[in-house]
């Protein structure tokens, strides 16, 4: 019976006239109309292969395969939730608080006279900053964050290397702080976790990105802090901040728009390597210099600025720092000093892989055993 049924189906298919199928039900996907001929992710990889193979030499194949592999994350504990309970839950997953573990280890070394680097108090953002990661080589993933008993999310998943610029900023209690390019909001949230900001200005030019920032603040920060005088969210042109609020801030974070190297290899949406964004990409270093210069102008004499990107490119990293310092010296007679952050390599070497040949600043490079980054950061002090 089954054989007869199968034979009947075959005979029926032979008799079906496909021409009788209504045109609206027939569709042949036109590849050229639906997919770009040269996807932006492929253009990004071609660009990186040409430039980074020269910049990094024998290191590039390792960095390349890591960039193309799954990224590793850290869980930033929300101190506005029941942080001790949250920390205990993360410890049960065999994750470790890499910030406080590194600080404790560094303090023991300093007390034993094994290190000549600055004490943790001189560079650590705050002992209240807690971020959990899995050990090197452990590719476990954190479960999605959920609202806790206090009504805010318990932790924020982020590239743990993104916390290093905040740590490098060295916040002190009562600081007036500016996050010049704040969206989507991970570093802004980290700044608030320190408990050191008397006032925090969080700015971004893009309305859509500001909406993402507001969403994070609403999910993680209590209403009385979010809507009070402590946090101010603006959508101004960051390049003009030196004119708007010059000589105002104790600490400024300048996390500039960049080629977002890892994102550019995985996502077509909002990819800066799209052919239509070629000019925008070419002038990125100019924009970055302008933003860093504005951040330095907004800082009080004696204050500190940290410049950061999530790009490997020295054109967007060291060259921008040097260009902004020269610009301020020549046009404003303002002297800026780059601060040494080499101790960050030793303090956090168990968690991150650092590139050892930066001219100024520090660079976390992706590595299969510790697949964070890329993250470049450089600390400066405005002298005059």
From Swiss-Prot:
Residue(s) carrying Phosphoserine: 206
Keywords: Methyltransferase, Mitochondrion, Phosphoprotein, Ribosome biogenesis, RNA-binding, rRNA processing, rRNA-binding, S-adenosyl-L-methionine, Transferase, Transit peptide
InterPro entries with a match to the protein in the record: MeTrfase_RsmB-F_NOP2_cat, MeTrfase_RsmB-F_NOP2_dom, RCMT, SAM-dependent_MTases_sf
GO MF annotation terms: methyltransferase activity; mRNA (cytidine-5-)-methyltransferase activity; RNA methyltransferase activity; rRNA (cytosine-C5-)-methyltransferase activity; rRNA binding; rRNA methyltransferase activity
Active site: 310 (nucleophile)
Subunit (UniProt): Heterodimer with MTERFD2/MTERF4; this interaction seems to be required for NSUN4 recruitment to the mitochondrial large ribosomal subunit.
Similarity comment: family membership: Belongs to the class I-like SAM-binding methyltransferase superfamily. RsmB/NOP family.
Protein name: 5-cytosine rRNA methyltransferase NSUN4
Origin species: Homo sapiens
Species classification: Eukaryota, Metazoa, Chordata, Craniata, Vertebrata
Gene designation: NSUN4
